[in-house]
A protein has these predicted regions:
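Early exported N-terminus immediately downstream of N-terminal targeting peptides
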Residues: 21-99
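A mature extracytoplasmic/lumenal domain signature
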Residues: 88, 114, 128-130, 141-143, ...
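Surface-exposed, charged secondary-structure patches
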Residues: 94-135, 187-193
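Juxtamembrane/interface motifs at transmembrane-helix termini
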Residues: 65-71, 101-107, 170-172
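Short beta-strand edge/turn micro-motifs at domain boundaries
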Residues: 136-162
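Sec-dependent signal peptide recognition
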Residues: 2-9
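Sec/Tat signal peptide C-region and signal peptidase I cleavage site
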Residues: 14-19
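Low-complexity, intrinsically disordered terminal/linker segments enriched in charged
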Residues: 152-193
């Protein structure tokens, strides 16, 4: 057991070092997204590509967990957690694909990542300019295997995870988790193309 612990302690830093830089993970994805958004209109295939790009960079399982009150999430069995995360992902992806204008930029500058927890968590700040107006985005990221994935996006000081958590907490004051899940499914269906 001590040998296994020692091997993990020795090799873990190397595994983290070989993972792509979190800024690279975000900027590569963003460049692909901007190429799509330069088109006058997006085909259904292009919109599916946008949804795929979101899935490539977002850890929807962690975002789903952080979007529910802790006691609610901890009270769910694994099947319910998986179902909620799946429907939540579908809702966010479909909603994002319908509001593509908010992702357009003329230029983007990324700050160096702020690393945390033995280089397994990072905050990446991006300054985006579109039509002369600047927005500041902070990607809260974690290392999943050897891939950097965002679990929260803070846009001009507004946290996506916190916003969903506040909405879902309000709903859960008067409705059951099953009813919340139906609301999420309905929203996902409404925004499906």
């Amino acid at each position: 057991m001590k040998i296994q612990t020692l091997l993990v302690a020795v090799f873990l830093p190397f595994a983290v070092a070989f993972a792509a830089d979190p800024v690279t993970a975000i900027s590569k994805n963003d460049k692909e997204l901007q190429v799509l958004l330069k088109k006058q209109s997006l085909s259904k295939k292009d919109k599916e590509k946008v949804k795929g790009l979101l899935s490539d960079v977002f850890n929807f399982n962690l975002l789903a967990e952080k979007s529910l009150p802790k006691e609610t999430w901890n009270g769910l069995d694994e099947a319910a957690k998986k179902q909620f995360a799946s429907e939540f992902q579908r809702m966010v992806r479909n909603s994002s694909a319908k509001r593509l204008e908010m992702y357009r930029t003329d230029s983007t500058v990324y700050e160096a990542p702020k690393m945390k927890k033995n280089n397994t968590e990072a905050n990446v700040t991006a300054h985006l300019w579109y039509r002369g107006k600047e927005s500041v985005l902070v990607y809260k990221m974690n290392l999943v295997g050897d891939v950097w994935m965002a679990w929260d996006l803070v846009i001009d000081d507004l946290s996506t995870a916190r916003n969903y958590k506040e909405q879902f907490s309000t709903i859960l004051k008067t409705k059951t988790f099953a009813e919340l899940l139906e609301i999420v499914k309905k929203k996902a269906d409404e925004n499906e193309e």
